[in-house]
From Swiss-Prot:
Pfam families per UniProt: DBI_PRT (PF02277)
Keywords of the record: Cobalamin biosynthesis, Glycosyltransferase, Transferase
EC number: 2.4.2.21
Pathway terms, separated by semicolons: Nucleoside biosynthesis; alpha-ribazole biosynthesis; alpha-ribazole from 5,6-dimethylbenzimidazole: step 1/2
Protein's UniProt name: Nicotinate-nucleotide--dimethylbenzimidazole phosphoribosyltransferase
Native source organism of the sequence: Escherichia coli (strain K12)
Assembly and oligomerization: Homodimer.
Family annotation (InterPro entries): Nict_dMeBzImd_PRibTrfase, Nict_dMeBzImd_PRibTrfase_bact, Nict_dMeBzImd_PRibTrfase_N, Nict_dMeBzImd_PRibTrfase_sf
Length: 359
């Protein structure tokens, strides 16, 4: 689909001049050079994003939660009933799930999007982008057609861009779908080249005696569908799921606007791997929130070259980690914009990164 290809070629480059200017500004603040550590690095990263116009700041915040069922659930790779996807999606509309509570704490809006829930009728209160009632069973068929994947990517990209036009400057991604760590593991295994046994974890508390079956299912899915690891759309269509496609769409949409997107857990790492295969230019816009407790998390993050800011031993998904990390983004912006400057206080510090204003 030519429209998608055109969009992928228009993602703006990071502004290195703005980043250098931000570095000089931060070095001149009331503190020893480098003493605010990763907050400084984060502020400089934000300054380089064209959508923020060279000044790290946060306007409106949004967490986009992609909800979908998966045909591979039939293979016994999850212990939760498939109906839990629809039930939890409804609970999200009531604001009672983990991501809703954490997003409210962070001052972010949660957008609950149905991209493939297996119900006869759309669920009231959800944003309806449903492609089908669940993806195909990747152990016996592709998850979806390439055309379906490309159309959903474009729909989500357009939705994300519209939110940006309405003042959202910080995006978070999340997902909801029983059995979705299985296609996520298949994506990670395909793109990183690691064996399924190295990346398949217990997901939502799968008993360890069922893990061998899950590993076998992932291996069968890859062998049967033969996804091309260099083609992110192909990987998503063959061994992914509608929720994973949707997450990738948010990343591409935010990056196309020059804006940051907070990753969540393992599902978002998998989607990021696929999105970066489509457009490596999006990588500087990705901010890892927390280290997922899922087995293949480190492998995926290492391939992406990302180091999470938090390690809370979380594996809920939903966008909970992205929401939790939003105040860290705001803190980086606050130190950049609100701290005083050394020159204004007639303080001269030696260029020693270990020096301390109080010593």
């Amino acid at each position: 689909m030519q429209i998608l290809a055109d969009l992928l070629n228009t993602i703006p480059a990071i502004d290195s001049t703005a980043m250098s200017r931000a570095q000089r500004h931060i070095d001149g603040l009331l503190k020893p050079v480098g003493s605010l550590g990763k907050l400084e690095v984060l502020a400089i990263q934000l300054a380089g994003m064209p959508g923020l116009n060279g000044i790290p700041h946060v306007g409106k915040k949004a967490v986009l939660v992609m909800c979908a069922d998966h045909g591979v659930w039939e293979e016994g790779v999850a212990i939760s009933p498939k109906e839990v996807t629809a039930i939890q999606a409804e609970n999200m509309t009531r604001g009672t799930t983990g991501v809703c509570v954490l997003a409210e704490q962070a001052g972010a809006n949660v957008h609950v999007i149905d991209v493939g829930i297996d119900t006869a009728e759309p669920i009231p209160g959800l944003i309806n982008m449903r492609v089908a009632r669940g993806s195909g069973n990747i152990a016996s068929a592709p998850a979806m057609s390439r055309r379906q994947a490309e159309k959903l990517l474009l729909d989500v990209i357009c939705y994300t861009q519209e939110l940006a036009k309405n003042g959202v400057t910080l995006f978070g991604v999340g997902e909801l779908g029983m059995a979705n760590t299985t296609p996520a593991a298949a994506i990670v295994s395909t793109i990183t080249g690691r064996d399924p046994e190295e990346v398949v974890g217990i997901g939502a508390n799968l008993p360890t005696d069922k893990l061998a079956n899950k590993i076998d299912v992932v291996r069968r899915a890859i062998t049967l569908n033969q996804p091309n690891p260099q083609d992110g759309v192909d990987v998503l269509a063959k061994v992914g799921g509608f929720d994973l496609v949707g997450i990738a769409g948010v990343m591409l949409g935010a990056a196309s606007c020059g804006l940051p997107v907070l990753l969540d857990g393992f599902l978002s790492y998998a989607a990021a791997l696929a999105a970066c295969q489509m457009s490596p230019a999006i990588k500087p816009y990705l901010i890892p929130s927390h280290l997922s407790a899922e087995k293949g998390a480190r492998i995926a993050l290492s391939h992406l070259g990302l180091e999470p800011y938090l390690n809370m031993e979380m594996r809920l998904g939903e966008g909970s980690g992205a929401a939790l990390a939003m105040p860290i983004i705001e803190a980086a912006c606050a130190i950049y914009n609100n701290m005083g400057e050394l020159a204004a206080s007639n303080i001269v510090l030696p260029g020693n990164t270990t020096s301390d204003l109080n010593s």
